[in-house]
Each structure stands twice: as C-alpha cells, then as structure tokens.
Amino acid sequence: MSERLSPRRIPKGTDAAKLHKWAAIFLIAGIIGRAFLENALLGMNTMTSEELYAAVEADPDSMWILTAALACKVLQTCAAPLLAFLLVEGYQRTSSFEKYLVRIAGLALGTELPYNLAMEGKLLVLGSRNPVFALVLALVMLYFFSHFAGKGLKNTLIKVLIFAAAFLWCRMLRIEHGVCLVILVGIIWLARTRTNLRSLYGFCGTMACTLFDFYYIGACLSCIMFHRYNEEKGEQNRIFNYAFYPVVLLIVGIAAKFL
C-alpha cells in the first residue's frame, strides 16, 4: 500500500521573497514615473518649475501626466521601508558580513550608470549618487550598532554618533533618498526584537522621512507588511534580487531615449 503524501505546509503571512517582489513593483513605478512621465514626456529634467507651470497651462492634458508622475513618486517611496527592513533582516541572518557588504557595494557601483541614464538621461552625473549607496552606509552603520549593543549611556551616545555620521555622509555624497533610508534602517533596527511593534516603528520612521521628502507620506502603507512578516525566507533567486534594479534601470533608460 502506498503512503499518502501530506501536502507541503505553506507558512501563513508574508515572507522575505514577497517583500522583495513588492519592493520591485514599487521601484518599477518610480522608475517609469521619472524616466518616462517626468523626463521623456514632460521634460522636467530640462526645465525650471516656472517653465513646467507654463507648459502645463499651455497644454491642460499635461496635468494628467504630471498627476500620474506624482503618484509614481509616492509609490516609489513605498519601496524604502521594505528595503530597509530587508537590509536589517539580511544583516541579522547573513553568515558573512564581509560578503554581504561586498554584494551591496557591488550593486551600488553597478547601478550608478544605469541609474543616471534612467533618471537624468545621461550616463555621467556628478551631482548625486544612486540610493543603493545609502544601503551600503546603512549596513556599515548596523555593523557598528551591533558592536555597541549595550543599553548604557556610553553605548547609546556612540550609536547616536554612528547614526549621525551615516546621515551626514548621505548628505555630503548627495545620495538620493539616502537620508530617508538611513533613518528607516536605524528605526527598524530598534524594532528588531519587538516584532509586534515593527509596523508602528516603520510608520514613525516614514513620518520622520516626510521632513526631508514629503512624498514619503505614502510610504507608511508598506509598513503594514511588517506585521504580516513570518520570518521565512521564501523562494528567492539571489541573482534576480541583485540584478533586477540595474537591469530595469538600463532597459527603461534606453527605452526613454526613443520617446
């Protein structure tokens, strides 16, 4: 008599793979909004705010494109809490911090030219850096946080200085979304042992981010997913996770040139 095979148990909630997929969707919305809607169709990367206002007045249909572009900006910010959360989870679960740091740093370097092409329409942009560089700084910040994990006054002051250093480096390097990503990583790190409060901490982090970028008012929506997180890795493809962002940027950047 053959044995009856019991069906594989599917964990309830949201695993890390699903968080990656949602982050990818939000990032795609942001890339399309800026590369196609803002730059290719409206030309916002080549005009001042006064010129944009005049262009919208001259062509009322442009208002619909502008509205869609702004909606994409809000959707893009929803990726930031998810990426910050995944970075904290990745740091806590990695078997080699050095290899993890090298992968993130490699992604930052590999993303720079495609990011410039998609966001600015040219390969070389000296005035800013892509957001992945903020994840590199945030990862180094977590490394030092864990080495001063005590609750005493001395350790607390050291962690404040470490956070301030990461914050200032993001400002000095002009990393896009850098300050907000560092804030979110720092706050989510505080909630690493308070699993029932992760969504609340994430919400507070996104509200703090609105001081630097008002579009983060919508990012709090993605923090709801933290509450459903089931601590499972899920079915992931590491190559996809790391190659997705620069590849999509490159494809969109090239396609936008033909619009």
Question: What is the predicted role of each segment?
Answer:
Residues M1-L259:
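Alpha-helical transmembrane segments and their immediate juxtamembrane cytosolic regions
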